[in-house]
Amino acid sequence: MKRLLLLTAIFLTGCIDAEIELNTKSPERTPTETVSLYVDSFNSADVTALNEITASPFFWLRGEDKNVYDKYGDSVDFQALQNNGWSYSKINSLELIYEDSETSMVHMNFSRYGADDQVILTASANYLLMNYYNNWKIKGGF
């Protein structure tokens, strides 16, 4: 009887549907924290940091323009921005639109300021982020 009970228990154990969590480590930063760090690196014109925060290839979709770059640093021209009066950018709002374990979407409203601290542009952008080895990276913007 004990043998039958033991065999039944072993058999039933194999029938239990168990979910195994293979990726138990959470990303170091949230998607919104990643976008905030992106803006900090942008304000420092730190192309190396920007390339680390973003994924390659990187894309921009702006209106009818669709651009894909080997890396984010290829998409930005800080000298041209400065020639147009840009000094720094400031986040007005960040909103997490969507998040699952692999992807997320963040909406950012921001302003660009000149050296005189006057707003020269206010705009919005949506960013697609991908979870690469427990690090959120910005894959593209639109």
Task: Show which residues each predicted segment covers.
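Sec-dependent N-terminal signal peptides
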Residues: 4-12
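Hydrophobic pocket/interface hotspot
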Residues: 38, 49-51, 58, 74, ...
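Short beta-strand edge/turn micro-motifs at domain boundaries
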Residues: 20, 120-142
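A short gly/proline-enriched turn/hairpin at secondary-structure junctions
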Residues: 58-69, 84
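A mature extracytoplasmic/lumenal domain signature
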Residues: 54, 64-65, 108-112, 142
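Short, low-complexity N-terminal intrinsically disordered segments enriched in polar/charged residues
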Residues: 15-48, 52, 60
